[in-house]
Structure formats: C-alpha cells, structure tokens
Amino acid sequence: MSVAEQIRTIAAEARQASFAMAKLSSAAKDQLLLDMALALINAAPHIIEENKKDLEAGQKRGLSAAMLDRLMLDEARVKGMADAIREVAQLPDPVGEVTGMWKRPNDLMVGKMRIPLGVIGIIYESRPNVTSDAAALCLKSGNAVVLRGGSEAIHSNLAIATILKAQLAKHGIPAAALSLIPFVEREGVTEMLKQEEFIDVIIPRGGESLIRFVVENSKIPVIKHYKGVCHIFVDATADFEMAREIIVNAKTQRPGVCNALETLLIHKDIAETFVPFIYEALTTLKVELRGDKTFRQFAPKAAKATEEDWYAEYLELILAAAVVDGLDAAIDHINRYSSLHTESIITGDYANSQRFIREVNSGVVMVNASTRFSDGNQLGLGAEIGISTTKLHSFGPMGLTDLTTTKFIVYGSGQVRP
C-alpha cells in the first residue's frame, strides 16, 4: 500500500477503536494505564537504547543543545513518564459526568453529559515523553489517538508506542486505539491532515513552521499549541528579591521548554536600580541579555534588541528586555508580541495585578509567580496534552476534561411538542 493508503487505514481503524474506548469503564481504563506505566519501567533499558540512536542522529544533524535536551531519555525521565501515566490513572474520569441538569416548564429534564471527542490526532516534535503522556490522556478520556512524532525521535517514539500497544492487546482493547504513524517524511503529516472522515481534531505541538503547515493544510479542526514567547513585567512596586528569584527561575531552570521566560519588561520608575541589579544576576548565570535603548542605558554591556527579538522563542540562555512606561505599556507590548502562552506580573499593587489578569490575552496569566508553573501537573491537571494557544476548543494547559466535549441529554415522560 502507498503511504496515503496506509495512513487512511490507520485512521479508519482508529475510528472503529474509538467506539470501544468510549464504552470502557473507569476501572478498566485505570488498570490499563497502570499496566502501561509498569511496562515502561520494565522496558526502560530498551527505550534508552533506542533513544541513543535518535541522539546520535541528532548530533550528526547539528541539533541545538535545547533540542537534544528535549529529545534525551534516561532512566529518571522514563520513570517520570511512568509516573505521569500513574497520575492520569488516579485522576477522576470526566466521561459520563453530568455537568448540569435543569427542569423545563413542561417537566422535561435537560442536562449536559461529558463524552469523548472521538479520535485525536497529535503531531509533535522532539519530546518522546509526549508519546506516553498523550496516549495516557487520550485513552483515559475515552478517545483513540493517532500520533505522529518528529523524525528526530522516531526510534524512541516507536519503542514507546510498541510497548504501550502491547498492553492494549492484553486488555482485549483494539490495538488501533493507539497508533503511531511510522513515516518520517512530510507526506505522512499531509495525508494525516486529510482524514477528516475519521479524525475529529488535530493538536500540533512544535515550532512555528510546523504549526503554520498544519493550520494551512488541515481539513480537520486544529487546536494550536504554539511557541512560548513568555513575558514577565516587573512593576514599580515589585519586591526586588522576589523579582530576582522569579526571573532567574523562569529563565534558567530549564531554558529549553515552552514555559521559560523569553522577554522581560521593567517599569521605568525602577529601571535605574533594577536593571543593573537583574543584569548582574542573570549574566552571572551566563544569560545573554538583548535590551532596548533605555535598558542599555543602565546596562551598557547588553546587546541591542531588534524587532525580531520581541517575537523570539529562544529556548536557550538569551533574554530580551525592555523598559516600559508602565502597566498600560506592558500590557500593550505583551498583547502585541505574545504567542498567547504564559505571562506574569511581579507587583505589590493589587489593583495592577487585577488589571493585568483581566487585560492580558494569554492562556495563563500569573501574579508573583514563575512562568515555569504553566504546566498541567503544576496546575493540578495531571499530565497535559500541551498548552493550547487557541481559544477554541480549549485555552491554556489541556488536561483530561479538555479532551472531552458535551452532549445534551433529555428525560421525558411522554411529552410531545404542541
């Protein structure tokens, strides 16, 4: 069969498997996930060996340190993947939940019940842990899933998917409930995006070019998981030590992830003292700062920021920085350049914090906290499918509930419409 025919078959079989998934009890799904987690732990040496093939190929291709970090699996990360699956198993099952019930004047009882989306297609790059995270979330929420990982992680993804699929068979569940498209060529993505008859939604996670390609070519509704151009605004009333700790954590703890800080905005009234203070703290940690004209007045050794820097997701120890006139200017800057991921304000002014929360247009908005908390586990969702930068059908970190929709249920006692 051609690539197109094989992908159509994968999608069609996933559609059939989705009906079986939707009928599974919570207990059956939870036991499946627990067995999947154990299988990953037992197969860790094999997964790590396959991952080494991807790392070696990535080094030969000249992948950046950030990309290689995303790609790398060791024993601790495999354990983390298994732990994430176990956490999903412990979460309440949203399927079948009645979210509201009301009585009509004619005594009809009307309600809304949560149901699976059906078949979810996920297209992603670099991180092999997405394979297990996505599988766990989709299966727990009663969906089938079709995965298409990046070519740079093909050996890792195939190893993980094969281990997980084996558990489906042991539980008497159609193996097609979890499929990984094995083709690394772009044609595999193109054909997947044509399967609107079988796939209900596409969730792309990756760089700008991938997101744009999916949006422009998909016949299926898309929930974008775009890059993370995350901002922190240091207000005039900010505590300097708090600000330093938050900024250092947000930028340096793990710079190669989408919730790391990429642009720092500083209120002009504190620039003279705060800019040198934070410049020293960050450069000591080997962060390169690229500042606007005013920032560089107080930190002359900083590089000059260009217009492109305000849009940049560096994913490394580089930070764009600007001095702004105040809260209005900070909000305007964020709403202009943000990728709608995560933004934070550091302030001692309650009124300013509330304005920031109301007026900043991103999926996660924080007060006096590191952007690194923008994560499903950290926010109490369990493992996440990703962080949506699309307002429909979900916005921000997507957990189990976001992989369901609702249908109306109506109870009558013989009513007919007059």
UniProtKB/Swiss-Prot annotation:
GO biological process: L-proline biosynthetic process
Predominant subcellular localization, coarse grouping: cytoplasm
Leader peptide range in chain numbering: none
Reactions accelerated catalytically: L-glutamate 5-semialdehyde + phosphate + NADP(+) = L-glutamyl 5-phosphate + NADPH + H(+)
Keyword check for Oxidoreductase: yes
Function, as annotated: Catalyzes the NADPH-dependent reduction of L-glutamate 5-phosphate into L-glutamate 5-semialdehyde and phosphate. The product spontaneously undergoes cyclization to form 1-pyrroline-5-carboxylate.
Protein name (database record): Gamma-glutamyl phosphate reductase
